Regions:
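Short, structured loop/turn "capping" segments at alpha-beta junctions
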Residues: 88-92, 113, 117, 130-132, ...
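Alpha-helical transmembrane segments and their lipid-water interface positions
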Residues: 23-24, 49-57, 121, 132-133, ...
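Juxtamembrane transmembrane-helix termini in multi-pass membrane transport proteins
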Residues: 1-67, 134-154
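Juxtamembrane boundary at the C-terminal end of a transmembrane helix
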Residues: 192-200
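Selected transmembrane alpha-helices and immediately adjacent juxtamembrane segments
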Residues: 99-132, 138
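Hydrophobic/aromatic residues within the transmembrane alpha-helices of Major Facilitator Superfamily
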Residues: 14, 18, 47-48, 81, ...
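Membrane helix-loop-helix hairpins that form the core translocation module of multi-pass transporters
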Residues: 3, 34-103, 166-173, 182-185
Length: 200
């Protein structure tokens, strides 16, 4: 298991997810439910989603190496475009407005059922998310599924933990569109590096 891949995956997923709807969804849920229950629920959802992404990436490694690298590069570059578009969309808008849809989906439940409710909301929100595509690309690129899983899940747990504990405070000091642009640059760099390896 490569610690460098774990660190790289953590950094990439963290930067991409911090301005994502995942952060906002967790923030909104933590205002309705007990924060610990929210974190447990979303953490379980992230574990399953990341496992699925890593499995898909593992299957992709069975393809010819050059084809895998091209696909990974396209996913990275596609992610950069999507993040740039999101950054433009969020420029000058109130970030918390995007969380209203999650507030509507959150059912009025008590006790441990809040864990299940948080799981269901985040599992649906995260399906096909950019972090999943990025995880697939990283597994295909580095052939380190366990390292990618650890790095990605740790990043998602960290982002959701920040949302639960410091969400509103962070949104006052950090502009979402700036984070989107940073994430776009990370994906662009990974895409270019992968293409360089293909044609080197």
């Amino acid at each position: 298991m490569d610690l460098t891949v774990i660190a790289l995956t953590f950094a990439a997923i963290f930067v991409v997810e911090l301005p994502d709807k995942t952060f906002l969804a967790t923030l909104v849920l933590s205002t309705k439910y007990r924060p610990l229950f929210v974190w447990l629920g979303v953490g379980a959802a992230f574990a399953i989603q990341t496992l699925i992404a890593v499995a898909v990436g593992g299957v992709a490694t069975l393809l010819p190496t050059s084809l895998i690298q091209v696909i990974a590069a396209l996913l990275f570059l596609g992610g950069a475009v999507l993040l740039f578009i999101e950054g433009r969309r969020h420029h000058g808008t109130a970030s918390e407005e995007d969380g209203s849809e999650f507030a509507e989906k959150a059912k009025d439940v008590r006790g441990f059922r809040q864990v299940l409710a948080s799981f269901m909301v985040l599992f649906a929100a995260e399906w096909g998310d950019l972090s999943q595509l990025l995880s697939v690309s990283l597994v295909a690129r580095y052939h380190e599924p366990v390292a990618v899983f650890i790095g990605a899940w740790a990043a998602l747990l960290t982002v959701s933990g920040l949302a639960v504990l410091l969400g509103r405070t962070l949104l006052k000091f950090i502009k979402l569109h700036v984070l989107h642009y940073v994430g776009a640059l990370v994906c662009l760099a990974l895409g270019i590096l992968t293409l360089v390896e293909v044609f080197a």
